[in-house]
């Protein structure tokens, strides 16, 4: 099996059973295409989400190093920060979150509700900054300060998107391949592409397990020119760790994130409402709404390789719906 080196990495069991892979009959009828969904939004900790797959590897490494504090960074409404804080609480670890306000809003709902509300419930230590201009350096500076206070910190990068964290999505590709075997012949997979770890991990895994499947990353914060080098760098780092080659091209669509990261747009909000009304599935305004808008428009514009079944990776994020009201 090409991914056997995955077992070399310590892993903390946080998710348990594989997440569901479901057919969406009403959305499929609406779009005239078979649409499936990978439900990483229903992972079992703190309202779910995809970052738990990365945290299984990252937090295992933190515990191996003897850390008592997890430090990470993100937007005020970061799903990654929320899931990291929840795991820290579950394990009795301290959590420090370096947060920015990427949309510059003063709306109380955004500043206090949704994921931000949950951080307080998890007793997270909040550190605000004007902007995450160099998050790796900013996290290291924060870690040095926390260490001077007597803690043993472990830094988790933005989005959990290191080569180690992205192993969680190599593992997810294996899960998808097993769930689809003799059930559905996927043509394409669509995923939101942000901090790039989820996209890169899937790229490595699917290249070796389902090489005929087209993987599309819908960007949520950057142009193709900005995002592609980030995905490729992680793709190659992951492959190197697994003693694999990674030659698959990285496909990105950047038509759906404007006006910018964390700012809702009409197409994304229409996708949120469509999935809720047709399937009872909750997307979010920042990631999955925009990625689903790409899937819908991609079908309309015939951007996919063929007319076969499409799998949408639901990475979670529903808590942000409450913070973005009244946009919703």
Curated annotation (Swiss-Prot):
Swiss-Prot/TrEMBL catalytic activity: D-cysteine + H2O = hydrogen sulfide + pyruvate + NH4(+) + H(+)
Listed GO MF terms: D-cysteine desulfhydrase activity
InterPro entries: ACCD_DCysDesulf, D-Cys_desShydrase, D_Cys_desulphydr_bac, TrpB-like_PALP, TrpB-like_PALP_sf
Keywords, in A-Z order: Lyase, Pyridoxal phosphate
Modified residues (N6-(pyridoxal phosphate)lysine): 51
GO biological process, one term: D-amino acid metabolic process
Pfam assignment, any one: PALP
Keyword Lyase (UniProt): yes
EC code(s) of this entry: 4.4.1.15
Cofactor (UniProt): pyridoxal 5'-phosphate
Keyword Lyase part of the UniProt annotation: yes
Domain of life: Bacteria
Family: Belongs to the ACC deaminase/D-cysteine desulfhydrase family.
Assembly with partners or alone: Homodimer.
Protein task: Catalyzes the alpha,beta-elimination reaction of D-cysteine and of several D-cysteine derivatives. It could be a defense mechanism against D-cysteine.
Protein's recorded name: D-cysteine desulfhydrase
Organism annotation: Salmonella newport (strain SL254)
């Amino acid at each position: 099996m090409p991914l056997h080196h995955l077992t070399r990495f310590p892993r903390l069991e946080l998710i348990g059973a594989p997440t569901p892979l479901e057919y969406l009959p009403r959305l499929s009828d609406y779009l005239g295409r078979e649409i499936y969904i990978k439900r990483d939004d229903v992972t079992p900790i703190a309202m779910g989400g995809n970052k738990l797959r990365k945290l299984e590897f990252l937090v295992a490494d933190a515990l191996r190093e003897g850390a008592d504090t997890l430090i990470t960074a993100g937007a005020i409404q970061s799903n990654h920060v929320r899931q990291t804080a929840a795991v820290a609480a579950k394990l009795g670890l301290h959590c420090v979150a370096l947060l920015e306000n990427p949309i510059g809003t003063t709306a109380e709902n955004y500043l206090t509700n949704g994921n931000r509300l949950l951080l307080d419930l998890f007793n997270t230590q909040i550190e605000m900054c004007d902007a995450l201009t160099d998050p790796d350096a900013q996290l290291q500076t924060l870690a040095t300060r926390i260490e001077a206070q007597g803690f043993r910190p472990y830094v988790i990068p933005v989005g959990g998107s290191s080569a180690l964290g992205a192993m969680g999505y190599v593992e997810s590709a294996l899960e998808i391949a097993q769930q689809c075997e003799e059930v559905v012949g996927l043509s394409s997979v669509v995923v939101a592409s942000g901090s790039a770890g989820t996209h890169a991990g899937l790229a490595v895994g699917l290249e070796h397990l389902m090489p005929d499947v087209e993987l599309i990353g819908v960007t949520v914060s950057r142009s193709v020119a900005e995002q592609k080098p980030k995905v490729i760098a992680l793709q190659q780092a992951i492959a190197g760790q697994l003693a694999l080659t990674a030659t698959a091209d990285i496909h990105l669509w950047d038509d759906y994130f404007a006006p910018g990261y964390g700012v809702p747009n009409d197409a994304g909000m229409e996708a949120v409402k469509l999935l809720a009304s047709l399937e009872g599935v909750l997307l979010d305004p920042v990631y999955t709404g925009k990625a689903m808008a790409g899937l819908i428009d991609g079908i309309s514009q015939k951007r996919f390789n063929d007319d076969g079944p499409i799998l949408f990776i639901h990475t979670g994020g529903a808590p942000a719906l409450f913070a973005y009201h009244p946009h919703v």
